[in-house]
Amino acid sequence: MTARSEHHPADSAAAPALRVSGLRKSYGEVLAVNGVSFEVASGEILGLLGPNGAGKTTIINTVLAVLTPDSGSIRIGDLDVSRQRSLALARTNFAAVYASLPGNLTVVQNLSFFGLIYRVRFLRRRIEELLGQFQLEALRDTKCGVLSSGELTRVALAKALLNRPRLLLLDEPTASLDPAAARDTRSTIRALVRDTHCGVLWTSHNMYEVEEVCDRVLFLSHGQVLLAGDPRSLPREHGARNLEELFIQLAREPLAHPAERLA
């Protein structure tokens, strides 16, 4: 197993990459997120876990200001998303399997297009850096519509890093990849966190992946945080053999595991 990112939140007094406080969001009479609070420190990979419908996507969409919360606050660094939306989102980026890239554009055209949207300074230089970092030089003039899933994931991650985000949101980033490509992607992201000290909020249903890559995890159910802690020690603390068994227990009997206050 490869080493995780080194995370020492106590070493710095800087604001966390992300701070969510008392977040609530409902759709009509359905309460999707109910008073959720957590932080992602700079240089930390935090896993956001839970069954379908637990509230993960709603949380991500409120952080990205796609949705407006009913109450609560979201801060990216020292910026309040509700008051300083553009500045806060300029420090943020996002990658997911379902966030497809324009297939009629080449790799370089896609990166150029999004780089202009993000107002990236010295864009050509930045694109060349990312092409090298993600081993995309040979594909630079290939249209994204003919790339493999692994190649598309590398382009999507390069796109997400164009603006050197302080906060990176990754929703199932390896879901469409074969094991070798998924392993390489995890290694790349860990190296990026180590080198750039950005914070990462990572969702996944792959518990092996979560144990390998995440510094901490939050378990969600019915829009609430049930458990939070180190993915390697949580199973033992709650009588499960591994993280997958704990996930299944929480998904089936969430009320048996009261929420714990985050440190």
Range-by-range predicted roles:
Residues 143-147:
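Conserved ABC ATPase signature
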Residues 168-172:
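Catalytic Walker B motif of ABC-type/P-loop ATPase nucleotide-binding domains
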Residues 112, 116-139:
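Conserved ABC ATPase "signature" region
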Residues 72-83, 87-88:
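Conserved ABC transporter NBD signature motif
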Residues 183-196:
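Helical segment within the ABC ATPase nucleotide-binding domain
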Residues 164:
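Conserved catalytic motifs of ABC-family nucleotide-binding domains
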